[in-house]
Amino acid sequence: MQEPPLELTIEPPLSQETFSELWNLLPENNVLSSELSSAMNELPLSEDVANWLDEAPDDASGMSAVPAPAAPAPATPAPAISWPLSSFVPSQKTYPGAYGFHLGFLQSGTAKSVTCTYSPPLNKLFCQLAKTCPVQLWVRSPPPPGTCVRAMAIYKKSEFMTEVVRRCPHHERCPDSSDGLAPPQHLIRVEGNLHAKYLDDRNTFRHSVVVPYEPPEVGSDCTTIHYNFMCNSSCMGGMNRRPIITIITLEDSNGKLLGRNSFEVRVCACPGRDRRTEEENFRKKGEPCPEPPPGSTKRALPPSTSSTPPQKKKPLDGEYFTLQIRGRERFEMFRELNEALELKDAQSGKEPGGSRAHSSHLKAKKGQSTSRHKKPMLKREGLDSD
């Protein structure tokens, strides 16, 4: 008797009956052994399930070859961006050297229209962003061939000297009209010189620009280099209102120092106004100011700028003077003026005794003058009556 064929198209694969048969094949410890492989092959499975079981070992072997992904590391907050610090602080002391190296600047006023101006008493250059700043190089004798000029910026205050001076992130990303030689993070650039080299020191991380030294042209006594400062002194993330000093050094082909000079730089929107303000503050600081007494909260007044000392008022003395006046009208005018002054002194209480005595003396004199004036009139009347 033949068994009726299984209707695989009607029963879904891995139905409840098939699952129960598989479950009964499992041992007590729920681990399949190699003896059950023949029984698994004799199970009545559909064609697609059989193909899936045949391909499963290959997929498992392929998956085992691929390393399992590592567990993701716990998320940590990203550290704040910090610029590298430099352990080397270049000297800013003036050193003329054997060639008498020193700097010079063009004379300019403090008008609002100026884009670059130099203050001799402050030794400070005020300029606008990316504007031409001519710096003159003076030497007594020509340096050897291969000499170069290096410009480097450092912070003026001691607490910031180890930080590298660089542009702010905003100006680094802004496109500028450079020749493509200068890196975007460099603050100082040289205008119109294709031989300029922008260097980043590997040890100190400081930025500098080096150009070959060129002797003065015919009819000129100095060499002029045009520098540009590509970030404002007030930019956040850059200088951040911290004053900087630009150091100009004269070096030979081997890097030996031949001369050094420096000056302070402020990059601002109105160089003339800022120079005028800082020079006025510098003059005020130079004048001696009286110190307030201890415990006093009032501000001391600035000293007077006049050269002549204030004259002290002399107290009124008790002397009397005789003044000869021609004409009675003029005499009466001076007399009233004198009486008014005496009355004012008496009311103010400066010298009450002296003023009273003086006023009584004036009244007595007035009575005498009146009597003297009337006596001749009486004599005249007597003569007329006679």
From Swiss-Prot:
GO terms for biological process: cellular senescence; circadian behavior; DNA damage response; entrainment of circadian clock by photoperiod; negative regulation of cell growth; negative regulation of DNA-templated transcription; nucleotide-excision repair; oligodendrocyte apoptotic process. Residues 63-102 are annotated as: Interaction with WWOX. Zn(2+) binds at C168, H171, C231, C235. The modification Phosphothreonine is found at T18, T277. Residues 92-363 are annotated as: Interaction with HIPK1. The modification N6-lactoyllysine is found at K112, K131. Residues 266-273 are annotated as: Interaction with DNA. There is a cross-link at K284, K285, K344, K350 (Glycyl lysine isopeptide (Lys-Gly) (interchain with G-Cter in ubiquitin)). Residues 105-229 are annotated as: Required for interaction with FBXO42. The modification N6-methyllysine is found at K363, K365, K375. The record marks K112 as: Interaction with DNA. CDD domains: P53 (cd08367). There is a cross-link at K379 (Glycyl lysine isopeptide (Lys-Gly) (interchain with G-Cter in SUMO)). A motif (Nuclear export signal) lies at residues 332-343. Disulfide bonds: none annotated. Residues 318-349 are annotated as: Oligomerization. Residues 94-285 bind DNA. Residues 108-285 are annotated as: Interaction with AXIN1. Residues 1-44 are annotated as: Transcription activation (acidic). Residues 358-377 have a biased composition (Basic residues). The modification N6,N6-dimethyllysine is found at K363, K366, K375. Residues 361-380 are annotated as: Basic (repression of DNA-binding). It is linked to p53 is found in increased amounts in a wide variety of transformed cells. p53 is frequently mutated or inactivated in many types of cancer. Forms homodimers and homotetramers. Binds DNA as a homotetramer. Interacts with AXIN1. Probably part of a complex consisting of TP53, HIPK2 and AXIN1. Interacts with histone acetyltransferases EP300 and methyltransferases HRMT1L2 and CARM1, and recruits them to promoters. Interacts (via C-terminus) with TAF1; when TAF1 is part of the TFIID complex. Interacts with ING4; this interaction may be indirect. Found in a complex with CABLES1 and TP73. Interacts with HIPK1, HIPK2, and TP53INP1. Interacts with WWOX. Interacts with USP7 and SYVN1. Interacts with HSP90AB1. This is Cellular tumor antigen p53.
